[in-house]
């Protein structure tokens, strides 16, 4: 009897360890996917690739900004087009170590982080560091942002 109980306990422990390892592996995988998509999006932003940038958002995008209010896909695209035309060298960089990613089962993932934007103003570099949340949806194998919250400006 005691021998059977030991095997049952061992089986339960091994199963729990296996499930924890699989859960961590899935979390690492989605983290890597979103970190990559963040890089793709802001490489497009920094290189002024408007078409690539546009392709990373859904048409029903909601963009919440603590200073600018609620805007949409069209406003975001127009902003990117203005950035591409300007010569102020606006650039975004993710603050190293700030990225957090949480799965949203059946939908996608939530990306939380801190980023710095720098641009030239009167010939001098002007930078600000801000917080953000991106809600990514994975549909037909493609990641796109459906919601943005930009805050702490």
Where are the regions that the model predicts?
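Bacterial Sec-dependent N-terminal signal peptides
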Residues: 1-29
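Short beta-strand edge/turn micro-motifs at domain boundaries
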Residues: 129-153
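Short helix-adjacent coil turns
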Residues: 41, 48-49
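A solvent-exposed, acidic/Ser-Thr-rich amphipathic alpha-helical stretch
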Residues: 28, 32-33, 50-107, 114-116, ...
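A short, structured loop/turn motif at beta-sheet edges
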Residues: 101-109, 123, 136-142
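A short acidic/glycine-rich loop-to-helix N-cap element
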Residues: 24-25, 122-127
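Amphipathic alpha-helical repeat scaffolds
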Residues: 35, 39-43
């Amino acid at each position: 009897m005691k021998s059977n109980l030991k095997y049952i306990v061992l089986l339960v422990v091994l199963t729990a360890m296996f499930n924890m390892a699989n859960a961590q592996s899935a979390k690492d995988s989605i983290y890597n996917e979103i970190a990559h998509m963040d890089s793709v999006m802001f490489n497009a932003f920094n290189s002024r690739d408007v078409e690539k940038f546009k392709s990373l958002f859904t048409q029903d995008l909601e963009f919440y900004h603590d200073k600018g209010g609620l805007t949409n896909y069209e406003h975001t695209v127009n902003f990117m087009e203005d950035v591409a035309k300007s010569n102020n060298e606006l650039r975004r960089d993710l603050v190293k170590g700030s990225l957090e990613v949480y799965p949203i089962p059946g939908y996608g993932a939530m990306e939380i982080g801190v980023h710095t934007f720098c641009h030239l103003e009167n010939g001098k570099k002007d930078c600000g560091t801000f917080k953000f949340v991106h809600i990514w949806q994975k549909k037909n194998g493609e990641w796109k942002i459906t919601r943005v919250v930009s805050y702490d400006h």
